[in-house]
Amino acid sequence: MSVPNVDPSHQSNASANEATRPSPAAEGLDKSGERVREMFRQIAPRYDVMNHLLSLNIDKWWRRKAVQTLKIKGDDPILDLCCGTGDLAIAIADSAGSDVQVIGSDFCHAMLEIARVKESKRTRDTAGGSGRHTIPFLEADSMALPFDDDAFQCVTVAFGLRNIADTDQGLSEMARVCKPGGQVLVLEFSQPTLPVLKQAYNFYFRHVLPRIGQWMARNDKSAYEYLPESVGKFPCGDALAGRMRDVGLQHVTFRPLTLGVATIYVGEKPGGKTDHAEMAAHREREALVAT
């Protein structure tokens, strides 16, 4: 098994890189790196509870569905970026088996500290960690990942893409570090497809959740306003699938979950064995037509 090289200069500059990047005006939110990092630093101890509130406690099932979507082959490593407190990375590691190295990256140190505690407990509880890779959780800029091109068989992100200052740059980096033929997977909140549910969910987001946030929050009330707003303004469905295609991914599909409250998007990086087989078959068909 090969473990991707990490460029320490990228890792050490993660905070500076994201802090100085401007926020795109198109989505109408201040997603500058310093603002988002500080927000997540403040809510890190309650982040898991926040996700349960946002998802009405269905987020664990969504993650299981995301893991089941991955086509894990051989022992090539897997990257989960914007990993937060580590739930998806740990779920992937539990599913992938002991031969596959899973790596988590995030730009918020406080979130990574919680992920490391979870990982330490996981390795203790599973046969003492015998024969099992420990997940390294690295502080890194998702718009300038410190990994070589074509390093991972799968690159994933759950509930984090909408928080990257430049969505397209984040997707581009995911595609860059993915191996040809590998998968890029996004699990993200989206807009419910059923009109009645959409109306109820929007009411929950705009009126119920902020009140819960005010009760839970101390100095971080803005986080409980930003997170629902970021969901409402983030592209979903065909719009996000199109942006995945724009960064060079192919065979992009998406699957709404829980009537569209969340969606799994999957794309493939061109250049894998399947592509070569398809090209060979195409050439054979052309040769037959020519004769």
Curated annotation (Swiss-Prot):
SUPFAM superfamilies documented for this protein: S-adenosyl-L-methionine-dependent methyltransferases
Listed Polar residues bias regions: 8-20
Uppermost EC category: transferase
Pfam assignment, any one: Ubie_methyltran
Region ranges (Disordered): 1-33
Reactions catalysed, as given in the entry: a 2-demethylmenaquinol + S-adenosyl-L-methionine = a menaquinol + S-adenosyl-L-homocysteine + H(+)
UniProt-recorded Gene Ontology molecular function terms: demethylmenaquinone methyltransferase activity; methyltransferase activity
PROSITE patterns: SAM_MT_UBIE, UBIE_1, UBIE_2
Keyword set, alphabetical order: Menaquinone biosynthesis, Methyltransferase, S-adenosyl-L-methionine, Transferase
Pathway(s): Quinol/quinone metabolism; menaquinone biosynthesis; menaquinol from 1,4-dihydroxy-2-naphthoate: step 2/2
Disulfide bonds: none
InterPro entries given in the database record: SAM-dependent_MTases_sf, UbiE/COQ5_MeTrFase, UbiE/COQ5_MeTrFase_CS
Listed EC numbers: 2.1.1.163
Example GO BP: methylation
Residues holding S-adenosyl-L-methionine: 85, 106, 141-142
Keyword Cytoplasm included in the entry's annotation: no
UniProt xrefs under PANTHER family: 2-METHOXY-6-POLYPRENYL-1,4-BENZOQUINOL METHYLASE, MITOCHONDRIAL, METHYLTRANSFERASE
Recorded family membership: Belongs to the class I-like SAM-binding methyltransferase superfamily. MenG/UbiE family.
Chain's role: Methyltransferase required for the conversion of demethylmenaquinol (DMKH2) to menaquinol (MKH2).
Protein name: Demethylmenaquinone methyltransferase
Gene from which this protein is expressed: menG
